[in-house]
Amino acid sequence: MIEAKGLTRTFKSRKRTVQAVRGVDLTVDDGEIVGFLGPNGAGKTTTLRMLTTLLRPTSGTAMVAGADLLRDPLAVRKRIGYVPQAIGQTQGGTSDMCLVIEELLDQAEAYRIDRAEAVRRAAQLVKQLDLTGLDQRLVKTLSGGQRRRLEIALGLVHQPPLVFLDEPTTGLDPQSRSNMWEHIRALRADLGTTVFLTTHYLDEADALCDRVFIVDHGVIAATGTPDELKRQVSGDVVTLRVNGATEAARALLAMQPIVRELSVADEELRLTVEHGEEALPVLLRVLDGAGITMSAISLSRPTLDDVFLTLTGRSLRDDSPGGGDAVGAAAELAGAGAGTGSKE
């Protein structure tokens, strides 16, 4: 669905040159949900804007949805959906004073979809994205979650096989975020849509993505499933306290081949193991066999933030949402795709 090689984007600012994206290589297969995870300024949105034809690469190539990004950007635009970053609160403007159904039908018209088919698709999207009963309301009256679902619907009007979501849940409350995750999962389950999303939320990447690209300073630092990435960190951590035999327990556990690291602090033993769930019963049997009883035990696993910390030397910092009207930007892409006079 996506194959990019050496994507680079350089910006000139006064007397200096800034390389926002530096030689990104990536592949996305049909039907995947993949995530670009990284902090503000990592190059996530710049990469996404290149892949959606809104920003021309300084160098590099890409095939997107079967079309050449550089040679035939119009074909790319016709085959993708793009939902840019939300601004959180309505800022006013013509789209805010339109009805939800009008926004959907106008978007369909931008893609030159005939009226009857546009009405059918709009009704389908209203149902699929839980907008039932809202189609006759003004856009400005929608809640943040409702507006975000409308923006996704606008990106799906022309039934693209691939949709790009830029920070899809930024600014939403926890319940709305969870609800949005279900809708994103449904894009693949119900429509077979391939989803490429950017996010700075660790839990979002973990919960939604088949694969994650960790991005920092314009390069891909690592890629893999969330579990694969976590396994790159030192391992699961077992923390335990024993009843009056800490030194004996330490000596015994240090001999076990499954224990990669062991430390003791304040009578608490901290063990690093490869697979915590499998190692835990083994360790318990070893201690029990030696007559050592425990007073407390816990198991913790690495997080994607631990992965980011290991790869970059710092924790994933908070990202700031971008500006711009997301509804208007989605229409901009449709207009760019339909404005050349070419027909599908």
Please name every model-derived segment.
Residues 75, 102, 117, 228, ...:
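An acidic, carboxylate-rich microenvironment
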Residues 106, 124, 251, 285, ...:
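Surface-exposed charge patches
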Residues 182-274, 298:
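ABC transporter nucleotide-binding domain
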Residues 2, 9-216, 221-222:
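ABC transporter nucleotide-binding domains
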Residues 275-344:
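C-terminal coupling/interaction segments
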Residues 15, 32-34, 158, 246-248, ...:
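Residues that cap or initiate secondary-structure elements
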Residues 81, 112, 130, 234, ...:
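A generic structural signal for secondary-structure junctions
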